[in-house]
C-alpha cells in the first residue's frame, strides 16, 4: 500500500480511486498503482484484488484536470442573521433578500487514464481519479517513459 510511501520494490507508486468497475476491480475504491521494471500492478489498498499490465500492452496514458461548475443555493438565513446583527431589523430583511438565488462553485477533478490492449486483443481503458494529489502526475509521466510513449512538455506563454 502506498498511502505515504511507494510499494515495496516498485519504481514509483501512488493510490488512486477507480472510477468504473474493471474486470475484478470494484469502482469507487482506492487502488495502489505501482510501476515495476517491466509491468504495472494495480492492487486494492485494503485487500487482495489486483491486476497486472505489461508495458507493451499500454497504448496511451493521460493525466489531466476537469473543472466542473456547480450551482449552489445561497444561504438567505445566514445572510439575514448577519444583517440583523449588524444593522437590526432592516439589515435582516436586506440580508435575506440578498441571499436569494444561486452562486457558482468550481470543482476540480484530476484523472489518470490508461488505455491498453487486453489479452483478447480489445482496446480498453482504466480510469482513476487522483483524489490525493500526491504523486499522480509523476506516476503518469514515469509510466509514459516506461511504455516509450511521447512525454508532453509544458509550454508557457
Predicted regions and their residues:
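A short, polar/proline- and glycine-enriched secondary-structure boundary/capping micro-motif
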Residues: 51-54, 136-138
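Phosphoinositide-dependent membrane-docking surfaces
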Residues: 40, 52-69
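Anionic N-terminal interaction surfaces
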Residues: 1-39, 45-51
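Acidic, Ser/Thr- and proline-rich intrinsically disordered linker/docking segments
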Residues: 2-5, 61-157
Amino acid at each position: 500500500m502506498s498511502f505515504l510511501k511507494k510499494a515495496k520494490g516498485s519504481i514509483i507508486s501512488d493510490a488512486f480511486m477507480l472510477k468504473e468497475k474493471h474486470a475484478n476491480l470494484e469502482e469507487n475504491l482506492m487502488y495502489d498503482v505501482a510501476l515495476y521494471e517491466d509491468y504495472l500492478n494495480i492492487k486494492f489498498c485494503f485487500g487482495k484484488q489486483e491486476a497486472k499490465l505489461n508495458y507493451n500492452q499500454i497504448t496511451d496514458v493521460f493525466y489531466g484536470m476537469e473543472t466542473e461548475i456547480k450551482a449552489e443555493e445561497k444561504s438567505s438565513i445566514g445572510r439575514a442573521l448577519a444583517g440583523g446583527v449588524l444593522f437590526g431589523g432592516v439589515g435582516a430583511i436586506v440580508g435575506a433578500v440578498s441571499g436569494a438565488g444561486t452562486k457558482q462553485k468550481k470543482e476540480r477533478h484530476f484523472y489518470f487514464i490508461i488505455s491498453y490492449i487486453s489479452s483478447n486483443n480489445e482496446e480498453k481503458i482504466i480510469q482513476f481519479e487522483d483524489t490525493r494529489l500526491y504523486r499522480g502526475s509523476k506516476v503518469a509521466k514515469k509510466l509514459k517513459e516506461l511504455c516509450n510513449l511521447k512525454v508532453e512538455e509544458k509550454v508557457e506563454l
